Amino acid sequence: MTQIHQINDIDVHRITSGQVITDLTTAVKELVDNSIDANANQIEIIFKDYGLESIECSDNGDGIDPSNYEFLALKHYTSKIAKFQDVAKVQTLGFRGEALSSLCGIAKLSVITTTSPPKADKLEYDMVGHITSKTTTSRNKGTTVLVSQLFHNLPVRQKEFSKTFKRQFTKCLTVIQGYAIINAAIKFSVWNITPKGKKNLILSTMRNSSMRKNISSVFGAGGMRGLEEVDLVLDLNPFKNRMLGKYTDDPDFLDLDYKIRVKGYISQNSFGCGRNSKDRQFIYVNKRPVEYSTLLKCCNEVYKTFNNVQFPAVFLNLELPMSLIDVNVTPDKRVILLHNERAVIDIFKTTLSDYYNRQELALPKRMCSQSEQQAQKRLKTEVFDDRSTTHESDNENYHTARSESNQSNHAHFNSTTGVIDKSNGTELTSVMDGNYTNVTDVIGSECEVSVDSSVVLDEGNSSTPTKKLPSIKTDSQNLSDLNLNNFSNPEFQNITSPDKARSLEKVVEEPVYFDIDGEKFQEKAVLSQADGLVFVDNECHEHTNDCCHQERRGSTDTEQDDEADSIYAEIEPVEINVRTPLKNSRKSISKDNYRSLSDGLTHRKFEDEILEYNLSTKNFKEISKNGKQMSSIISKRKSEAQENIIKNKDELEDFEQGEKYLTLTVSKNDFKKMEVVGQFNLGFIIVTRKVDNKYDLFIVDQHASDEKYNFETLQAVTVFKSQKLIIPQPVELSVIDELVVLDNLPVFEKNGFKLKIDEEEEFGSRVKLLSLPTSKQTLFDLGDFNELIHLIKEDGGLRRDNIRCSKIRSMFAMRACRSSIMIGKPLNKKTMTRVVHNLSELDKPWNCPHGRPTMRHLMELRDWSSFSKDYEI
């Protein structure tokens, strides 16, 4: 047995240091925390080669007393707390005494500090935090900490850092932005020195400003667009009694005013005021930047109920007593625990919803350009010029139909009062006779149409509820009444004709002639697709027809369409199964009640079909005997299947076995192992898969599968053509977005965006657009460029070569759809095998670009209980 022994102090220090400082972001965060705790109002951070060479953090804080030089970089030496109980009352960002000690363990650390300028001391520390050298220098009051050669003694981390230092620098800037926004009294300056020695200003804020000004300084002039100040109070005093025994034993807790104040800025709920991503969501607790995913999720859910296409920009600070939170959770102290979190989230959600309910909805107003207005005027003039020749004759028809409709209480349109009275399905007459798809085709674009009143639709005797329709105002006085049929689909105009509907009914209502024991009989019947052939009494049938005709005359246009569809469905060929008895509305039919027909009677046969029935007793007995035998066989097979099911259940009493049995997993490699059975309905491929003695049956959509393969092929190999601009267009970006562009130039070039990087310009203004992608009539602009930046930031970085903006993705999806195997095409086995095997090469083979699933599981063949139900009588 291996002997237990103690790890030496140096190795322990190296192990624990790697847990505290994990990347560039945590290293910079610890330095900023120390500067803020030192009461500094000016913090300057200088990166050399994006932090790959060194990081320097300078402040004008209190400085370090010479008596503390020896303990400055030792593990767990701090001036913030003296005992564990102090953690619940700590007001500083740091308190554990691990930051500088951990930095010594993974990098080279030097400190320049003074409390009485201009004389200052420069201190250098070794890996365990001991002073190796002390020299005298000069500086203003404050402290400068220099961290160089980060992760120099950790080969794996150093190699990873050298590969991803720009990406880590971008993440680090996001953290610094969070500090700069909430600390309005501190001036932040962030610089980067390139390997060539050029110093670039990346981020800067003003001292003694406000959160509003800091947001504008960090994110530019448009940073405050759509934001609104918020000040909410969450009253949790009703929950104090429940918390007293569950969360704390402090008797003074009952005297505490348990209210949380939420202050800051959040996006308005109007469309266009939010953002397309969650890149600007910051939560603070007592001005401490934290990662509070639960609260942010609540904000996003509430915002989605008002604006379901965007995400809110969130800058919220929670002010509450320190005794109600626990910040000692993770080494970076960015994850906190909140007492009675569920109640806090529920009250916050309700309060935020009430806040948004009080807001007024602000819609962006679209202003038409002068060219659009002129084009609409020309269109409207041409339309009315074309109609002027037939206007007089239409007016005559209009007045005639108007008078007739008024006398018969039919529908008419009153253009002055905006009221439509509609009954009995009479058409409305219009001066325009065209098959227009919508009103704007005639009267112009949305710039000339205002919807400010309602049109009341009175159905008269119809049972359809009253509808309110928007009225339309135009400058033209020629529009009086609108014909509803002008806006209907021409294909359905013939269907709704009453004459044709009645003619179809005559075909359906022809009598049926049949022969029983040599005598011919005639009966009226109705043939429907749902019920088959149904016999009805003469009086009842005539009464029903009268009711149907009356109801048809009073029905609406929609009812006429539905009726016509049902009529067409009724006249479809129906296969009559002689094993199924004909349905009859009468309880019994005696032979004497049938009307005998003479031998010389001439008549038309119903669809040329003759129904022959042999009603002999012998056949009935034979059928009954066969039915009993079949029923016994079916019952026996059912019992055997039930026994197998019970046996399987008994074998799956173990939870793991049961879960494994009920769980079906399919990997991309399984597509290569699937065997093609055949094609179903000229649209689907039936395949089988054998895994662990299980035979699964799958159905594969031939069109969706081939479309997905073609789509991902286009995504991977297509390089978009681009159109050069006459003058290169400068692109104003935030520092983080610019770094994303610089780190992913091949992705933008593949999407057709040709860029030029001017290293002499300041950060945020170095990118210039040389050309835009082009494809026939599709236009691209800076919005697509910004969308591509967002998609790259959201991507995990594994397959960035396939990132495309939404317009290009839609074009690829359409091309892939049109070039794929269509539904209805017969396939041979070789083609079906190729389609199925291609799915194994795709990144995400489970859905086509339009969302259709490529495959579904049908059953496990081993558990198939055959078609026993089909043989039941």
UniProtKB/Swiss-Prot annotation:
One of its GO terms (cellular component) is cytoplasm. Residues 379-402 have a biased composition (Basic and acidic residues). It is found in: Nucleus. It comes from Saccharomyces cerevisiae (strain ATCC 204508 / S288c). Its main location: nucleus. This is DNA mismatch repair protein PMS1. Gene3D superfamilies: 3.30.230.10, Histidine kinase-like ATPase, C-terminal domain, MutL, C-terminal domain, dimerisation subdomain, MutL, C-terminal domain, regulatory subdomain. One of its GO terms (molecular function) is mismatched DNA binding. Residues 1-357 are annotated as: DNA- and ATP-binding. Keywords: DNA damage, DNA repair, Nucleus, Phosphoprotein. One of its GO terms (biological process) is meiotic mismatch repair. Changing G97A: Displays an increase in spontaneous mutation accumulation. Residues 379-423 are annotated as: Disordered. Residues 403-423 have a biased composition (Polar residues). Residues 661-873 are annotated as: Interaction with MLH1.
